[in-house]
Structure formats: structure tokens, C-alpha cells
Amino acid sequence: VIWIWIGLIFTLCLPLAAWLALTLLFRYLKKKQFLDHVVRIFQEKPIFIVPRGVPIEGAEEVFFPANHNLQLHGCYLRTSARRRKGVILFGLEFGSNCWSCLPYCENLLANGFDIFAFETRNQGESQSSDGYEPLQWVTNFELEDTKSALQYLKNRPDADPSGVGLFGISKGGSAGLLAAAQDPYVRCFVTDGVFATYTTMVPYMRKWVTIYSDKYWIQVLLPTWIYRWFGKLGLKRLSREKRCRFPHLERAIRKLAPRPLLMIHGSADTYIKPEMAEALFKKARHPKQFWLVEGAKHNQALQIAGDEYQQCVLNFFKSHLAPQEDERTPVRIRDPESLANGELEKQKGSESLMVPVSLKFLPPNS
């Protein structure tokens, strides 16, 4: 009987002890102002050169409506090919303008695809929301602006009734995926340097804590969910201060399937580390592919991979966006093992994705 009582007391005391431990932990981290540091660092903007283009000859410069009575700026570029194969919405990286899409899209334009690039509010020539200061993180404002861009494409006289593709760089890719998760009009997705909130924030929080505390148990022994908890608290505080919301791409990316996704990322990216990108990629459902471009820093995969990059993106959209009667001879990857050995198999009669030998496949259960 005594052992039953001991077991019962232990069972009842365990939740109390856990609650007490969490309370003490919270007070310790609060005393160290860890949450304040999380909020402050979350708002720090990365330092890198943002590409900005100049107006493109022959482009259709447009302004279209968004919520809060704003007018957003964009450019519509028509293909030089005789037959249009599809329309692609281009999502810009943080701070750039719509004309910067050209280096990414020249090959697409020459091969049958129209491109529509646009600037979210408080960026480029788009109107600004009073009191809103954009960060590198996607908020509900960029999400709503991307939805407005999709609506604009649907309303054009030359709209493609079958839908559009998405090609997004960094923040523009994140906003595009968030919008596409709610809109089947987007049929396929290519992203470069894309990132989400928690899969980026939690690893950095583990790194930051070593700066503000030399306690081993804080640095190593705390479980990941503790960092997620503080991350959520930090985002809630920042949401109140900024009067915006930070949507979770980790949830939305699961809703993209069965539409195909190609994620491109640089192996030398020091802002969004490859393991962060892979953690996000694993949350997506098949069909999906991941290409880690060797030696590329953040948003520098095009500069490193060059023609290989252009051809990979083109063939992806040819395979998944263009009409299937395309006359080209596709190249098909037989399986990840053949990819590792550099073996490519040509197959006539059906569209298939041609990918570079360096494309990295994760196993089907990822």
C-alpha cells in the first residue's frame, strides 16, 4: 500500500515540479532580458547589397489596387517567343525593385513565358502604409499584397485561365508560397533563398543565448520547444508593437501539394543556413526537389550556377506550367542514385523535369 501512495504522490508532484521549473526558468531568462534580446535581434536588418534594376524597354508598367486603398507598382514583361507558354509571378527580394527581375527571367522571356514582377507596399514605387516599416520577415501585409498581385493577373484581359507559376527570391518567395497555399491558381513554384519564421529563428536563438548567458544548461540542455515558446512570445510582442502579423510558412508549405515545388538554396548562405532551408523543405509534401548550389551565398545562386540555373528553372516551368505538347525532348532523372552517379536518361513523348547533376534530392519519406 505504501508503494501505491508513494507512486501517487510522485505522479501528482511531477507536474507541479515541472511547472515550478518552468516558472524559475522563465524568471531567469526574463531577468537576463532574453526575450528583449530576441525581439531586438529579430528586427535587425541584414547587411548586403540589394540589386535594383532600371526600367526595361517594352515593359508594361502598371499600378494595381491593394487593400487599405493602396496602389502597388509592377511591370508586365511579354515573351518574345511566337507562342506564350505560361505566365509567371515573380516575387522580389527584400528592398529591391520590380526591374531587378530581368537577370532571373531573361531566359524565361525568350522561351515563351510572360513575367509579372511587383513591389509590395513601402517598397520601390508602390505606395506606403503609414506607420509600417517592413522587415526582412514576411508579414500579413506582404501576404495580402501578393494576393492582390494574383488577383491583378486573374483580371487582365490576357489572363491565363489555367493559372500561373511562381518564381520568388528570398522574402518574395516566402510571401508567394504563403499566398499560393490559399490559391490553386498558382500551379507550381520555384524559390531561391526562401525562409520561414521558426525554422530560421530557433537555430539563431540557440546561437544568441551563448552571448547572453555562460550557463551550460541554458546553452545545451534546453529543449527546442523552450526556444519555440520564447520565439512565439517574442513574435507576439513584436506583432503588437508593429501592428502586424507574422504568418507561419512552416504550416502553409504543407498545403502546396500536389503542385510541384523546386527549392534552390546556396550552400554558403550565412544568413539562411542550408540546414534551415532543408528543415523547411522537409515540411513540404511531394512532389518536391531541393537544389543546393555549391559555393553560393544568400541570393547568389544565379551568379554561381549561371546557365545551369537558368536552364533548370526554364525546364521546371516547361514541365509543369507550359502545355504538354511542347516539342522538346525532356531529360528525366531515374532516381536519386542515378543522380549521384551523374546519369541522365532521355525520354521522348512526355514532359519531365531536367535538373542539374548537382540537384539534391531528399528521400521520399522526408
Give residue ranges: language-model regions.
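The serine-hydrolase catalytic nucleophile loop
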Residues: 94-107, 120
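Catalytic active-site module of serine/aspartate enzymes centered on a nucleophile-bearing elbow/loop
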Residues: 305-345, 351-361
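Alpha/beta-hydrolase fold nucleophile elbow
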Residues: 159-169
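Hydrolase active-site cap/lid region
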Residues: 181-245
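An N-terminal hydrophobic leader/cap segment in hydrolases
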Residues: 6-64, 75, 355
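Catalytic nucleophile-loop/oxyanion-hole region of alpha/beta-hydrolase
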Residues: 124-157
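Serine-hydrolase catalytic core
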Residues: 229-314
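Conserved alpha/beta-hydrolase
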Residues: 108-129
